[in-house]
């Protein structure tokens, strides 16, 4: 019996281990929920072991610090033709860096993940399993003498019929299509809130790229980003996208704060100690040095020239233009007597939103690369209070505001819900975000308008192409209004591009892009405008295809005016009284539109570089000669937090700052031309509180 017992013990242990494995594997394979990730699920794709540390930080480190989930996928083995030993050393380096970011011991669980039937090495941080590193390990030598040659990844991406195989255990061979399918499956499996990748926009052919040449990147960086963006098309979802400038960031100004640079440098050092091309170990290591020292001081984002500017009336018949900088990644305003742009700071990778506060002053919103929303308010003397965070929510896209300038906004959160926010006073303070009723499959491009009864109505489309609306309910005394459940709008399938406004008959007009044709389509509110159930006219196809969002406004009589861009670098169209007219102007971005003292303004980015904006204006039926705004600054960006206003400082912050804003207005001597001048102090007026019937 003792002998039998002794023989059974190993078998028992084996069975126990097998059972434990069966129990644990599904849990290990299942992606974490949004709740487990504290609302943040980052999925970063990079070519090499260190690209994320040099080009995507401090963003990744910030999300780990916030308790978010971070999964990084390294496409190549990063072996430089030196074999597994060098690859494994670099892998140890990134693990050390991520353990440091997570404030946990450098202890990892190693196993193999799968995507699209492919086996991929996977490491999970034991002290914080929200952090995972996946290694596809595509072989990565130069296929020639070095720069000016292809790599296996860039060759497979650019040449038909090529393949790339992997280094180390679990060998795999990929075609270009198989790489895209695998990346798409990784996106679908994880369900990210943000997909991060490198710069796909560099147009220099792979075989003409050179080390540290201006504007040049690495062929693997470019190839990886192009493959990821194609994978995103195959795996759409409610997630944000952020692309990162890599090598060329060294050509731009430092835009990280000193504390960010210090932290980013130490993180990179933990990697460099394990990469013998950088350091032999911690002792005597002087990294980051050389170009790495420049990269750790910067974080810049890919811009695609398709971001519409924002327009704001200055209160005296002039127009102020705001734009996100493609070079400085900051919020910018067209400036003064010097006729140039100046920066309002911040780091943003997307568009801006402008609106009007109840006291007649301008407001701005911007989205940071972590999904946070920041607001800024202008004073009557033209200075700005400073950026304040609209905390409690991370959003996939910039919020949408009502088109007549009201300071209220709706945005799609990382949680898949639409959320509402409005000012809580006239001093620049805001309420907390309010959850709207759930809408399955909601997309990130809602529209909002104010109905005839004074209450707001929000429109949203779903991934299935359906249109819905929700309206504010009457508010109890001292309470903010709630919203009724979403109701279907009878309409053809939509592909986004929503815009809504109240017209001269106090009826809401709704516009959207029709799925299939991409035509601008119009619906007009019918029936009793006080009824919570909104009736609609038959959909009218206006026959104009367009991209992005329509710019929408109304003249003094309430007649609705829209402007759209038919395609990238295509013609602008103006829609008045339901009739589209093609303008003699082309643009790279969708337009912005405003009507100020009878003058219609349309502003859009021109094609090509550098970043410039064309200002079209029409008064009394006559178009003025177009004005071009150029010279958007290359510097001035930085973290919003260092520019943020404390609530107690809001009335006084920056009150002695110089007024740098410039106004575009019709010339007093020649109405057929536009003048550019310094923005005067705004006319003060009593605040007009929102009235709700």
Feature map (PLM): residue ranges:
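Bacterial N-terminal signal peptides
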Residues: 14-26
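Bacterial N-terminal signal peptides that target proteins for export
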Residues: 1-16
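Short, flexible/disordered intra-domain loops and linkers
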Residues: 81-89, 204-219
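A structural motif
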Residues: 302-693
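The feature marks non-catalytic terminal segments
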Residues: 169, 190, 194, 214-217, ...
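Active-site rim/loop-helix segments in enzyme catalytic domains that contact anionic ligands
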Residues: 30-189, 261, 270
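Proline-aspartate-enriched helix->loop->beta-strand connector
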Residues: 179, 183-205
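Short, surface-exposed basic-aromatic patches at helix termini and helix-loop junctions that form
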Residues: 60-67, 73, 188, 233-234, ...
């Amino acid at each position: 019996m003792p002998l039998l017992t002794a023989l059974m013990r190993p078998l028992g242990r084996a069975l126990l281990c097998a059972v434990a494995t069966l129990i644990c594997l599904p849990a290990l394979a299942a992606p974490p929920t949004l709740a487990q990730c504290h609302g943040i699920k980052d999925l970063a794709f990079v070519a090499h072991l260190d690209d994320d540390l040099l080009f995507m930080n401090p963003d990744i480190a910030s999300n780990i610090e916030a308790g978010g989930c971070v999964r990084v996928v390294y496409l190549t083995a990063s072996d430089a033709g030196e074999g597994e030993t060098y690859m494994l050393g670099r892998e140890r380096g990134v693990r050390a860096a991520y353990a440091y970011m997570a404030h946990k011991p450098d202890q990892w669980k190693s196993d193999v993940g799968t995507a699209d039937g492919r086996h991929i090495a996977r490491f999970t941080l034991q002290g914080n399993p929200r952090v995972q590193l996946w290694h596809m390990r595509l072989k990565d030598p130069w296929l020639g003498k070095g720069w000016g040659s292809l790599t296996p990844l860039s060759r497979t991406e650019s040449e038909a019929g090529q393949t790339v195989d992997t280094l180390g255990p679990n060998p795999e061979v990929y075609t270009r299509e198989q790489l895209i399918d695998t990346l798409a499956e990784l996106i679908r499996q994880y369900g990210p809130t943000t997909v991060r990748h490198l710069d796909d926009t560099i147009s220099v052919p792979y075989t003409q790229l050179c080390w540290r040449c201006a504007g040049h990147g690495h062929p693997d960086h470019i190839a990886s980003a192009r493959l990821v963006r194609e994978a995103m098309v195959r795996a759409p979802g409610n997630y944000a996208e952020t692309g990162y400038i890599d090598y060329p960031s060294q050509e731009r100004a430092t835009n990280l704060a000193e504390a960010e640079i210090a932290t980013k440098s130490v993180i990179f050092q933990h990697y460099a100690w394990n990469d013998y091309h950088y350091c032999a170990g911690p002792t005597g290591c002087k990294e980051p040095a050389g170009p790495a020292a420049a990269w750790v001081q910067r974080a810049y984002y890919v811009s695609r020239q398709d971001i519409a500017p924002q327009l704001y009336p200055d209160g005296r018949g002039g127009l102020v233009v705001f734009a996100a900088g493609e070079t400085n990644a900051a919020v910018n305003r067209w400036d003064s007597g010097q006729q140039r742009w100046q920066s309002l700071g911040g780091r943003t990778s997307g568009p801006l939103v402008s609106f009007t506060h109840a006291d007649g002053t301008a407001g701005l919103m911007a989205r940071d690369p972590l999904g946070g929303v920041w607001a800024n308010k202008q004073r009557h003397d033209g200075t700005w209070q400073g950026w304040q965070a609209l905390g409690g929510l991370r959003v996939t896209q910039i919020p949408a505001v009502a088109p007549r300038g009201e300071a209220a906004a709706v945005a799609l959160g990382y949680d898949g819900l639409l959320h509402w926010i409005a000012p809580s006073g006239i001093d620049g303070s805001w309420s907390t975000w309010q959850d709207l009723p759930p809408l399955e499959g909601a997309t990130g491009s809602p529209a909002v308008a104010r109905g005839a009864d004074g209450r707001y109505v929000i429109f949203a489309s779903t991934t299935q192409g359906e249109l819905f609306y929700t309206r504010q309910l009457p508010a109890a005394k001292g309470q903010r209004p709630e919203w009724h459940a979403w109701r279907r709008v009878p309409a053809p399938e939509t592909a986004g591009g929503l815009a809504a406004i109240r017209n001269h008959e106090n009826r809401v007009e709704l516009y959207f892009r029709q799925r299939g044709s991409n035509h601008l389509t119009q619906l007009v509110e019918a029936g009793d405008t006080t009824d919570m159930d909104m009736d609609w006219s038959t959909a009218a196809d206006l026959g104009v295809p367009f991209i992005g969002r329509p710019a929408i406004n109304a003249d003094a009589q309430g007649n609705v005016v829209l402007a759209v861009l038919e395609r990238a670098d295509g013609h602008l169209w103006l829609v008045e009284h339901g009739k589209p007219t093609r303008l003699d102007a082309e643009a790279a971005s969708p337009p912005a539109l405003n009507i100020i003292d009878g003058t219609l303004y349309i502003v859009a980015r021109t094609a090509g570089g550098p970043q410039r904006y064309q200002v079209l204006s029409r008064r009394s039926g006559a178009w003025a000669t177009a004005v071009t705004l150029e010279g958007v600054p290359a510097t001035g960006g930085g973290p919003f937090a260092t520019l943020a206003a404390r609530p107690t400082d809001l009335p006084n912050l920056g009150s002695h700052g110089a007024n740098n804003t410039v106004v575009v207005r019709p010339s007093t001597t020649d109405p057929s031309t536009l003048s550019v001048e310094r923005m005067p102090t705004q006319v003060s007026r009593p605040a007009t509180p929102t009235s709700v019937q």
